[in-house]
Curated annotation (Swiss-Prot):
Job description of the protein: Involved in the regulation of the intracellular balance of NAD and NADP, and is a key enzyme in the biosynthesis of NADP. Catalyzes specifically the phosphorylation on 2'-hydroxyl of the adenosine moiety of NAD to yield NADP.
Protein name per the record: NAD kinase 2
Keyword Ribosomal protein: no
Listed InterPro entries: ATP-NAD_kinase_N (IPR017438), ATP-NAD_kinase_PpnK-typ_C (IPR017437), NAD/diacylglycerol_kinase_sf (IPR016064), NADK (IPR002504)
SUPFAM superfamilies according to UniProt: NAD kinase/diacylglycerol kinase-like
Name of the coding gene: nadK2
Its EC number(s): 2.7.1.23
């Protein structure tokens, strides 16, 4: 099947425009088609860093019927970008010679107040937007697990486990294990509030419900982050999360596994 490519970028600079123009020319020189409609593309390529890649996946609807690829602008390739902007010929050559490999990354599906539905590829986090703590009750499969009080929580996918989650001492999880990891942000533990005090990992058979306590404006304006986006919802009462039914198919080069990237970025 012929490859139809959609290029995504949100940084509008002269340098990026020139690089994108060069990349599009190389693409068409090798016989690939370009489209301005991402719904008609079977390959979606983001130009930028991991943030640009996450934005491209979100703005193109978390499609499962296409391939995604990330092209980095800096020497640091990141977790989602396997290619560098200065390797344009290598990118296309790898495609021509069928040296592209595809990895399937799991997602998290969630709702806010049982209405606002979303997917995340990296992480979901909820924090207080004012200088005070949040009180939340956590339920696993409708069974009460703990009452949390603190700055907030981050719930990450396996690939997202290397981001915010890692900075709060969460574990790095292999993306071959579809799951979601729940990590605390500065929890308060005393005679009244007691939490697990460590991250925990839930399987696709588990559902997590977070109920935000309604006390003294506690749930007025919490900050909600979904990958690289912020969601503004007044009066958040309940968040439901589970391992998503969608997988994102991402192009990678051989000998550049998830753990190769972890070693390159952290060791």
């Amino acid at each position: 099947m012929a490859k139809t490519i959609f290029y995504f970028s949100y940084r509008k600079t002269e340098e990026l425009h020139a690089k994108a123009k060069e990349l599009k020319k190389i693409t068409t020189d090798y016989g690939y088609e370009l489209t301005d409609d991402y719904q008609k593309a079977n390959v979606i390529i983001s130009i930028g860093g991991d943030g640009a890649f996450l934005k491209s996946v979100r703005e193109t609807g978390f499609r499962q019927d296409c391939l995604y690829a990330g092209i980095a602008l800096t020497e640091q390739l990141g977790q989602y970008c396997d290619f560098h902007i200065n390797q344009l010929d290598e990118i296309i050559k790898a495609a021509i010679e069928d040296r592209w490999l595809v990895r399937r990354y799991p997602t998290i599906y969630g709702t806010v107040n049982n209405t606002k539905a979303f997917y995340v590829l990296n992480e979901f986090n909820i924090r207080s937007s004012i200088i005070r703590t949040l009180t939340m009750d956590l339920y696993i499969n409708d069974s009460h697990f703990e009452t949390f009080r603190g700055d907030g929580m981050v719930i990450s996918t396996p690939t997202g486990s290397t981001a915010y989650n890692k900075s709060v001492n969460g574990s790095i999880v292999d993306p071959l294990l579809p799951s979601m990891q729940v990590s605390e942000l500065a929890s308060i533990n005393n005679n009244k509030f007691r939490t697990l005090g460590s991250s925990f990992i839930l399987s696709p058979k588990r559902k997590l419900r977070i109920e935000i306590a309604s006390e003294e404006g506690n749930n007025e304006f919490p900050m909600i982050g979904m990958d690289s986006e912020a969601l503004s919802i007044q009066h958040v009462h309940e968040v439901n999360l589970e391992v998503g039914d969608r997988f994102i198919n991402i192009i990678k080069l051989p000998k550049n596994s998830f753990w190769d990237k972890v070693k390159r970025n952290f060791l």
